[in-house]
Design a protein with these regions (language model features):
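N-terminal amphipathic/basic-hydrophobic helices that include classical n-h-c signal peptides
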Residues: 1-38
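Catalytic cores of processing enzymes, dominated by hydrolases/peptidases
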Residues: 165-246, 287
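Internal, conserved structured core segments that host functional sites
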Residues: 132-182
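N-terminal short beta-loop-beta anion/metal-coordinating cradle
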Residues: 38-129
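Gly/Ser/Thr-rich loops at beta-strand to alpha-helix junctions
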Residues: 62-68, 132-135, 162-167, 201-202, ...
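A conserved C-terminal secondary-structure "cap"
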Residues: 230-289
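Surface-exposed cleft-lining segments at the edges of enzyme active sites
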Residues: 128-135, 194-195
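Secondary-structure boundary elements
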Residues: 144-157, 213-218, 246-251
């Protein structure tokens, strides 16, 4: 007969911990403190207690047009006190294992972190490097994420994204998914649009921004116009400044978009420098006849 130690498995009955949970002591890429399954999500808690805690809102972004949202969240986590709370694994994510900050191989996942401002405002961020390629998998993952986030007490979710437009247009606005939320935002002085994006939106982030009313979450898309270039740090900066102004978050913002752009370009530049002048002026080994 198989005997299980009490410390290894625990049967939970609360709505937020429904199912069989497993405590892992395995020394893998960064030993999980608590893992469990929820609607296809493999939830790996990185901190104790296994709870998201009180927070003002959640910001979510994935790589997209101009990488506006992803760059914005990356900038926030770099300049604010940030703590990773949980990693969300799902088989629908592309099978790309990457190195984490400790140089260890980690399976594909979305990372959920907490940022606390100097004024005590606590914000959750959710981001990743990829999304499912199949529309059906995007839908199943979006519903699983929204169900779990609602179960964890998330009530306000803003998806950060870029909208391709002309270089002269530099605007930021929010598109909510419910009338109640729209009224609340307009009352608070937020720039809310009803006619954009005119062609709609696709992908996992679009589903997350629109599924909120089905899960009791005020979800919306916070958009900055962009020329669509990879890593538009200027649009990301504008979007963060707009969010901070609308919601009085008090979070530290990346101080200089130009410096961020220079740093990004430097990281992309070749490490070895060729002396092309010397190469052109040196004496050739061969001769012309």
């Amino acid at each position: 007969m198989l005997h299980l130690k009490k410390s290894e498995f625990a049967l939970t009955t609360t709505p937020s911990n429904r199912g069989l949970s497993h405590r892992s002591n395995v020394k893998h890429y960064s030993a999980a403190r608590f893992v469990r399954w929820f609607m296809g999500l493999h939830i790996e808690w990185r901190k104790q207690p296994n709870d998201l805690g009180e927070h003002r809102m959640m910001l979510f972004a994935l790589p997209g047009v101009g990488n506006v949202g992803k760059t914005a969240i990356d900038g926030l986590t770099q300049v604010n006190q940030c703590e990773e709370l949980v990693r969300l694994h799902h088989t629908a994510l592309p099978p790309l294992a990457e190195l984490d900050e400790d140089g260890l191989l980690t399976p594909p996942h979305l990372s959920l972190s907490a940022i606390e401002s100097s004024t005590g405002v606590r914000i959750l961020t959710l981001s990743g490097t990829s999304q499912p390629l199949d529309p059906e998998h995007q839908g199943s993952l979006a519903h699983a994420l929204m169900h779990w986030l609602s179960d964890q007490g998330v009530s306000e979710l803003y998806v950060l994204a870029g909208l391709m437009d002309s270089p002269t247009r530099k605007e930021c606005f929010i598109v909510p998914s419910s009338k109640e939320h729209r009224i609340n935002l307009e009352t608070a002085g937020v720039d809310v649009r009803r006619d954009e994006p005119s062609s709609g939106a696709i992908g996992l982030t679009a589903l997350m921004a629109s599924l909120g009313p089905l899960h009791g979450i005020h979800s919306a898309c916070a958009i900055a116009t962009t020329v669509g270039s990879s890593g538009d740090v200027f649009a990301s900066q504008r979007l963060l400044e707009a969010l901070d102004g609308w919601f009085d978050l008090g979070i530290a913002l990346p101080a200089d978009a130009q410096a961020m752009l220079s740093e990004k370009l430097a990281s992309l530049a070749p490490k070895s420098k060729e002396d092309y002048v010397a190469e052109l002026t040196e004496s050739p080994d061969a001769f012309y006849m």
